[in-house]
C-alpha cells in the first residue's frame, strides 16, 4: 500500500474517532473569510476547548459513514471547516453563531449534537441557550424563591405583630 493511502486511512480513522467522541460538532463554510478572521475564530474556539479543523470532504464523508452519520454528507460540498467539542455541547455553536453575526461570510451548514445530525436552525437555537453556569444559576434562583418568599412572609408577620404589640 502506498504511503499516501495509508495517510488517508489514518486521517479517516482520526476524523471518525472525533465524530464518535465529540459531544457536539458544527460544520461551517468559511469562504469569504480572510486569514485574520479565521485566526480570530480559531483563537476563540481554542480558548473554549473546541478543535477547529479543515479536512478534505471525501475523507470526512468516509469518516461520517464509518461513524454512522451519513446524513451529514449532503452538506459536505465546497470548503468546509469542522468544530469538534468533547466537553461543552453549547460552546462551538455559541462561538460560531456569534462570529457569524459579525462576519456574514461565515455560514453554518449543519451540526451533530450528542450523535444526532442537526439542522442550521437547531444549531442556532442551541447557540441561543445560556451557558451551563447560567442555567444552573437560573435553577438555583427558582429553587430558592419559595424559601425566600416564606422568609419574607414570616418577617412581615413578625413586623406586624411587633407593631400591634407596641
Swiss-Prot record:
Xref: InterPro entries: Ribosomal_uL10, Ribosomal_uL10-like_sf, Ribosomal_uL10_bac, Ribosomal_uL10_bac_type, Ribosomal_uL10_CS_bac
Q: Which UniProt keywords apply?
A: Ribonucleoprotein, Ribosomal protein, RNA-binding, rRNA-binding
Q: Does the keyword Transcription regulation apply?
A: no
Protein name per the record: Large ribosomal subunit protein uL10
Q: What is the lineage of its organism?
A: Bacteria, Bacillati, Bacillota, Bacilli, Bacillales
The record's Gene Ontology biological-process terms are: translation
Q: Family assignment? A: Belongs to the universal ribosomal protein uL10 family.
Assembly, in brief, is:
Part of the ribosomal stalk of the 50S ribosomal subunit. The N-terminus interacts with L11 and the large rRNA to form the base of the stalk. The C-terminus forms an elongated spine to which L12 dimers bind in a sequential fashion forming a multimeric L10(L12)X complex.
Signal peptide (from-to): none
Q: Does the keyword Oxidoreductase apply?
A: no
Q: One cellular component GO annotation, for this chain's record?
A: large ribosomal subunit
Q: Which organism is it from?
A: Lysinibacillus sphaericus (strain C3-41)
According to its UniProt entry, what is the function of this protein? Forms part of the ribosomal stalk, playing a central role in the interaction of the ribosome with GTP-bound translation factors.
Q: Which GO terms describe its molecular function?
A: large ribosomal subunit rRNA binding; structural constituent of ribosome
